[in-house]
From Swiss-Prot:
Keywords: Allergen, Disulfide bond, Seed storage protein, Storage protein. The keyword Glycoprotein does not apply. This is Napin-3. Disulfide bonds join C10-C62, C23-C51, C52-C107, C64-C115. It comes from Brassica napus. Coiled coil: none annotated.
Length: 125
């Protein structure tokens, strides 16, 4: 399936950006920590800063589609690694998307503040 990339240009940007590698690592890290991460305007951790840099290199149009691609990749990783089932897995996955949703705002991406991902992703795909 075309997945998040209905816009071919964005798929290309996603590949050029090495699938937003830093963002994937950041999403994974955040999702595996239960509890909310640091609040407020603390120093950005270096990994988050790298992720923001990746997003700033995208065209605004592609920020959400590429983030969605990154989220999906992380979701797959978690599924394979964890062997977690049901409830716990769903929580991790929803944290991935929650984190991704707000990244444009966290990173001050012009013209994009929140990516409209569904909060609850449908069951195993």
């Amino acid at each position: 399936s075309a997945g998040p990339f209905r816009i071919p240009k964005c798929r290309k940007e996603f590949q050029q950006a090495q699938h937003l590698r830093a963002c994937q690592q950041w999403l994974h890290k955040q999702a595996m920590q239960s509890g909310s991460g640091p609040q407020g305007p603390q120093q950005r951790p270096p990994l988050l800063q790298q992720c923001c840099n990746e997003l700033h290199q995208e065209e605004p149009l592609c920020v959400c589609p590429t983030l969605k691609g990154a989220s999906r990749a992380v979701k797959q990783q978690v599924r394979q690694q964890q062997g977690q089932q049901g409830q716990q897995l769903q929580q991790v996955i929803s944290r991935i998307y929650q984190t991704a949703t707000h990244l444009p705002k966290v990173c001050n991406i012009p013209q994009v503040s929140v990516c409209p991902f569904q909060k609850t992703m449908p069951g195993p795909s």
